[in-house]
Amino acid sequence: MNFDVNTIPVSERVHITKNLLRYGISIDQETGKIDYIKVTTVPEVRCESIHLIRHAETEAVAKHEFMCDTSNNCGFTASGIEITRKQAAELDEYNFDIALYGPIPRVVNTQLIIMERPQKFEAIKVHKLHGIDNTGWEYKSFDELCNTPLFIARELENNMFARTPSGTSWGMVIANCVDVLDLINEQYKGKRVLLISQGSVLRAFQILLRKRKPPWDDFTVEGMYHVGDDAGKKKNYGVIDKIY
């Protein structure tokens, strides 16, 4: 049995489709797959730069488990805290004007670690800076989920509409990031912006700003720490990435 996109409200699918279209991204209404529209003009990004720090490494990552926004496995590992503090000590060289951080506890707590050290910028919470919520999958392993229609649709077939009943889809994460870009363009023109959020938000910005060709150039599960041996995988929790 395949995932049925009709289980997702029409209003939600329309919102996702319209927001992605603003950045020249089409979405197939049956498969949920996205692609860049070749001849299109996308909105200008008016800030000077955008960087993102992903939340600190969590216990869920260390245990190869999924987590939701509020699950008990979202606490940070000792190494995760250490890495984030080290990154926080190096932020002066970027001369950020403002930091925007997401609303969920592990992101809020990462922001608190960063701001423990006196910084030159203010940090402001932004509700739309919200990545994937895996409610319904928390504490589960890859092996427990990998053969389910929903997991196959969301993580292997890259269906932008697929989500758990109380979670969020990749399409909604990207649509939310369109709204964040609107906010940046309206309020932080010419500024150096730091985002503190989740890995799914990093991917969403990379897709919107065409840093990936095609927009979805891999299976997300290949980089998941839930899958197999993570010894050879680059752990970028608590570490800064340049988006724009």
Locations of regions flagged by a protein language model:
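Active-site-proximal alpha-helix that buttresses catalytic centers in soluble enzyme cores
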Residues: 2-119, 168
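Acidic, low-complexity terminal tails and accessory targeting/binding regions
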Residues: 2-49, 132-144, 186-191, 206-244
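Active-site metal-binding loops of divalent metal-dependent hydrolases
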Residues: 56, 199-200
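Phosphate-handling substructures
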Residues: 59-63, 71-75, 116-176
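Surface-exposed helix-capping loop/turn segments at secondary-structure junctions
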Residues: 93-98, 186-193
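Short beta-strand scaffold positions
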Residues: 101-102, 175, 196-197
